[in-house]
Curated annotation (Swiss-Prot):
Sequence similarity: Belongs to the UPF0173 family.
Domain of life: Bacteria
UniProt protein name: UPF0173 metal-dependent hydrolase PTH_1415
Keywords: Hydrolase
Keyword Oxidoreductase appears in the UniProt entry: no
Keyword S-adenosyl-L-methionine: no
PANTHER family cross-referenced by the UniProt entry: UPF0173 METAL-DEPENDENT HYDROLASE MJ1163, UPF0173 METAL-DEPENDENT HYDROLASE MJ1163-RELATED
Amino acid sequence: MKVTFLGHAGFLIEGSKKIVIDPFLTGNPLAKAKAEEVKADLVLVSHGHGDHLGDAVAIAGQSNALVVSVYELADYCARHGAQSHGMHIGGSRAFDGVKIKLTPAWHGAGFGTGEGPMEYLGNPCGFVIKIDGKTIYHSGDTGLFGDMELIGRFNSLDLALLPIGDNFTMGPEDALEAVKMLKPKTVIPMHYNTWPLIEQDPAEFKSAVEAATSAEVKILSPGESMEL
């Protein structure tokens, strides 16, 4: 299975199905891929902020893909022309062999264009994704929370995708504590260095995690892939 970092919190998972998560490409200063180049079967969106909703509707439309998110955000995507399936935190569903479960995330979720008030698009979430015998956790934008221990207890995680940027999400120190609770085999840091406000050194995070846990940290540049 191939996992490609699209930049910021965006990933493309390619196995028996293609899954795109939080595809913020247009307007992303570090993204290498263009939205029109990305094809998917499922598009997962963790919350309604523009740097996560991003190009989800466009990618879903050009691929005839299904957007999966919390109900309010799925409804928003449907109103903008995308096929969508709404869920809520704690719920799970299988989509043609891919099982998705929504997990909590501590963050906000409004969408705005800069004109007028933001539109509420439901609670933010993370995802536990089971595909081709592998289990992947994408936390979405979140702070550290104790129930990460339950996610790690109930799932043997092959890969965890965790933010380290601080300010809007947990920083490297809290992300290390998340790894201790989640107990994944591999971690890819995300949501850092897109802008100066979330600048971090992923090599320092890698050193701290690998010194304190059995997890391996893979640092991917936007456009770079790894085999899982």
